[in-house]
Amino acid sequence: MIYLSIIFLLLDVLFASIKKKSLVTCVSECWYHIKWAHYVLLSLAALMMLPMLDYTPGNWQFLAFFACAALLFVATAPSYFERFEGRVHSASAILCAACAIAWAVAVVPVALIGCVLLIVAAFDRKHRLIWLELSAFATAYIGVILLK
C-alpha cells in the first residue's frame, strides 16, 4: 500500500506539471491545474499512508495519525488562496510536514536520508517549496519502507 501512496503522489505532481508545462511550485498548486484529480490522488496518498500506524511503536503513533489526518485536510481544503480555506490548508500542511519528519526522527532516524532533496531545494529557488514538500514525503515513505 505504501507503494500505491508514492505512485498517487507522483501522479498528482506529474499530471499537474504536464498540464502547466513546467514543474509546479508546490504540491498544493496541483489543485489549480487538475482540480478533482488532485483531491482524489492526494486523499488516496494519505489513506495509503495509514499503515504507518501499524509499524509505529505505541508512543509515537499519534505522529503518524496526525501526519495522515493533516494530509487529508490539505486534500479537502485545496484552495489555499481563499481566506478560510487557505488557513485550514496552510495549518494542515505545516502540521503534516512537521509530524512526518518528527515521526521519522523518533522512529527511523535513518529515514532522514529523504531530506537529501533539501540540497536540490537550495539550488532551485523557483521550485524550493515543492522540493521541501517532496523531501518530507520521501522521509516518511523511506521510514515506512524501512520499518516494513
What residues fall within each predicted segment?
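Terminal transmembrane helical module of multi-pass membrane proteins
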Residues: 108-148
